[in-house]
A protein has these predicted regions:
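Short glycine/serine/threonine-rich phosphate/pyrophosphate-binding segments
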Residues: 21-28
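Glycine-rich Rossmann-fold phosphate-binding loop(s) that bind the pyrophosphate
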Residues: 17-20, 43
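Glycine-rich flavin
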Residues: 2-5, 10-11, 28-34, 40-118
Length: 118
């Protein structure tokens, strides 16, 4: 069934947005036996938390922190010699974390039979 067919379906609960609040509400309603749909205006689930707020900033911070620990750990002395870790590379690492979070959250909706309408 495509998203265009969603308007012909009936739901017990319709949740606006798939951020943390919407996700929690949708999962609780689904587990209570309700037929649930989530309306998401963006192309991926997760809301601001996943795409531009909490997750990206923490992923970038963790990547930088890990790099600093690696560079200062005597066990790895010289391991990065001649190699450069660039800011675009750190952003790429953070982006991969975001994609992983989207996949996890998409799995929540699928396993709980919650329809996401985008």
């Amino acid at each position: 069934m495509s998203d265009s067919d969603a308007d012909t379906q009936e739901y017990d609960v319709i949740v606006l947005g798939s951020g943390p609040g919407g996700e929690g509400a949708a999962m609780r309603a689904s587990k209570a036996g309700k037929k649930v749909a989530v309306i998401e205006r963006y192309r991926e689930v997760g809301g601001g938390c996943v795409h531009w707020a909490t997750i990206p900033s923490k992923a970038l911070r963790q990547a930088v922190r890990s790099l600093q620990e690696f560079r200062h750990n005597p066990l790895f002395a010289g391991a990065l010699e001649g190699r450069e870790i660039t800011f675009p590379r750190l952003l790429q690492i953070a982006s991969s974390v975001i994609h992983g979070q989207v996949d996890i959250r998409r799995g929540f909706y699928d396993r709980n039979h919650v329809r996401v309408i985008q």
